Amino acid sequence: MKKQTAGRDQLGEFAPKFAELNDDVLFGEIWSREDKLSLRDRSLVTICVFMGKGLVDSSLKYHIMNAKNNGITKEEMAEIITHAAFYAGWPNAWAVFNMAKEVYANDEPAKE
């Protein structure tokens, strides 16, 4: 996993400690424990948590792009959102589907 610098890039001057915790602890330590949980699975969990909390903003879009880069296909993403909709709420699912459609827009259609 490449070194995360988003915290420092976006908040470093305003909230240096938060930026440090974001980049060094959350992404530097937690996300890097691939022997415990793969990046793909961490992406899946993160998206479901964001969806469940109704957090549909640029940070969710980042995590959907991250999930795609970590190997979650368009079809899998659709199934993840559909499954989570019954637990996280239908309106949340609609919002996440629209964001996922943007991220996966240039993918080839699935072959039947």
For the regions a protein language model found, what residue spans apply to each?
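Acidic, glycine/proline-rich low-complexity segments that act as flexible tails and inter-domain linkers
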Residues: 1-41, 52, 69, 93-112
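Aromatic-enriched hydrophobic runs in primary sequence
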Residues: 2, 47, 61-62, 75, ...
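Short, structured motif recognition centered on aromatic/hydrophobic residues
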Residues: 41-50, 60, 80-81
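A short structural micro-motif
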Residues: 51, 83-90
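A cross-kingdom feature marking solvent-exposed beta-strand/loop segments within repeated
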Residues: 60-83, 95-98, 102-103
